[in-house]
């Protein structure tokens, strides 16, 4: 018995981990190299040092967003969202924990305080996943780019939204439908030693800890920042591509273009912090720790497609970042995903060839946790198929089951979907208690699902 897993991201790692723990041999393919041999250079004008400002001592195969050869690399934010079960992301993570999720184990191992959010040290996080996969006796890792599948073997495709061009062409021929796509943007990271901490305060919204640094801005400072942000040069897209953004992760300049106050009612809102600040504070910019030690800080909600030069110019208008050194600048990349509602069963099997299962963000789920969770389900269903049993999905009353139902049955054009409570069937109780009772029901039903299918001995 053997299963091919294509891609060593969050979903692929979860699928391989589940199968290997069931005694099934896994061949895991990852095109990113064993070593990338980057020599960092610092840009004297911008203070930036990044792999995009680096020399290479050997050619590599990678993507436009990845920087390392590690498994489960987090290319955008370093947070997996809230861990409170009355949020969609928090409930999904609790369900994943019941399913023995490798990603949740890695997140707990590399946890960085961030209020009610599950933030991680991204290096420790991916190191944990990489070491777990490489040390498993039932997993063989093959470092090469896959260009096509043996369609008679059992395959789990977890190549993510940055699937390579060659494999994308193969998939397009296989499924006969075009991919959908959206543009995703990454937020900058600054060195903590370059931040002026006299221009703000530490604290989380609604007094949930002191894990964020809040850079304060007066209305005059905000006005200058806002106008320069609108004027700033952006990275151009290809002429033939229509720019489509995911509403849950809009570039900061796109939000600003919708009106003067959209930022102060969005990522720069002082909501939940007002009793800490004086009356002349009009907006705040939150910085979140990227590592346990806090030597690197990311700009929360500041994903951007501005050119590198303009990012440095505009973001240094934020008072606490006047002399900021950027260890990573923001960037934009094109994310592709399947029209899963036309192509996949809720079990994540390809309708035209059940030997091929898909998992991860390529299926149309959005967010780290949702991507990883689909990897667990793909692994479970590959195992059931090898056991001669029917593939299955968790009940629609669970967040994971509801997500799978949504992406495989939505009418019309599919757009990426986060785990949200609106996907769950209603429950007749007072609004005040509805989310909590939905969460309890979901966890109870997930436990029954696990027991019924004997997923864990």
UniProtKB/Swiss-Prot annotation:
Organism: Hydrogenobaculum sp. (strain Y04AAS1)
Keywords: Cytoplasm, FAD, Flavoprotein, Methyltransferase, NAD, NADP, Transferase, tRNA processing
Keyword Ribonucleoprotein attached: no
Location(s) in or outside the cell: Cytoplasm
Reactions catalysed, as given in the entry: uridine(54) in tRNA + (6R)-5,10-methylene-5,6,7,8-tetrahydrofolate + NADH + H(+) = 5-methyluridine(54) in tRNA + (6S)-5,6,7,8-tetrahydrofolate + NAD(+); uridine(54) in tRNA + (6R)-5,10-methylene-5,6,7,8-tetrahydrofolate + NADPH + H(+) = 5-methyluridine(54) in tRNA + (6S)-5,6,7,8-tetrahydrofolate + NADP(+)
Cofactor: FAD
EC class of the enzyme, as a word: transferase
Ranges where the record places region Disordered: 38-58
Name of the protein this chain belongs to: Methylenetetrahydrofolate--tRNA-(uracil-5-)-methyltransferase TrmFO
Family membership: Belongs to the MnmG family. TrmFO subfamily.
Source taxonomy: Bacteria, Pseudomonadati, Aquificota, Aquificia, Aquificales
